[in-house]
Amino acid sequence: NAALENKSIVFYGASMFNSFHPPVRTLMGPGPSDVNPRILEALSRPTVGHLDPAFIDMMDEVKALLQYVFQTKNELTLPVSAPGSAGMETVFTNLLERGDKAIICQNGVFGGRMKENVERCGAEAVMVQDDWGTAVDLNKVEDALKANPDAKLLAFVHAETSTGVRSDAKALCALARQYDCLAVVDAVTSLAGIELKVDEWGIDAIYSGTQKCLSCVPGLSPVSFSERAAQVIRERKTPVQSWFLDLNLVMGYWGGSAKRAYHHTAPVNSLYALHESLVIVQEEGLEQSWQRHASNHRALVAGIESLGLSFVVDAACRLPQLNLVKFPDTIDDAVVRSALLSDYSLEIGSGLGAFAGKVWRIGLMGFASSQTNVYLCLSALGNVLRQQGLDVDPAAAVLAAKQTY
């Protein structure tokens, strides 16, 4: 307090602050997802230098574990030291130069963000538009590829977080290869939640996030590039417009050479957390992780339908880890979500873009994808809807979910 009384030191806050202790929530929205306690413990381990030999060894393990979850042997595989949006920017700023052309598929919010990245690189974005709530149309994509033989890459969102839709990544990558385009995939929500095979499907560049089905803390973005894409980066005619995201520089640190070149101070403790999250996926098994997400999704669907609610997306292209649920016009979206948060400490998401105010986005991602959370969500949502005047039976919804297991 003596320092505050010194007239030469001005404190602009209204009062002295105390340590922040967040409430304990169950996170069943579009992300971030609940963080496994093991990962939180890893985050609190002693910080070491980012060039410490022990840390360098751990970096090599992180790379190998990322290769496992991506199902790739790509040498250029690493976590970008920033959220998934930076992973997206890393891909486009490294692969595109001014005057290039990219075909971008948009069936939700995040295809639009791809377009913005392309144009900020000085490249042309050729858009393939599909209705929100539907998968990317393969025929439209092939028409665009035929009409633009000079396109450098084809980019699409595998699991569109704003709509809960899964597009056919394997078929889209095959089209890209057929027309000699690089295949670029947004896997922010799909990684570890649904089938994803980078090498087998011919994906050239992919980016994800740590805060979805990996159940890690937000702030890192795993990326991977095929040798074909890496060659494009090495042979650029102009420097990458972002110094921080320039992979030609970053790989001096992540490249695995005997001597690591300092590029930036890595987020050491966040990388501990990522390492632990990837170890957890490895322990469970990647296919088992996919199956768990699918199993809990089936249970949630049964319970939601028992409550008389319906889904936006057709079952054939519906994401198991993110569910868009329609609600009656008589229901106040904000009131329901507020009640869930205040009475049950349960977070679900609101609609984005064209779906704002029309749907809930209920996530079952990573550590949050559990039977316990399915039952909690159905019981809590049912109780709140009944308070809002709907004739629903929360217990019957939970029973319907249990019968699917």
List each language-model region with its residue ranges.
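Conserved PLP-binding catalytic core of the aspartate aminotransferase-like
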Residues: 310-343
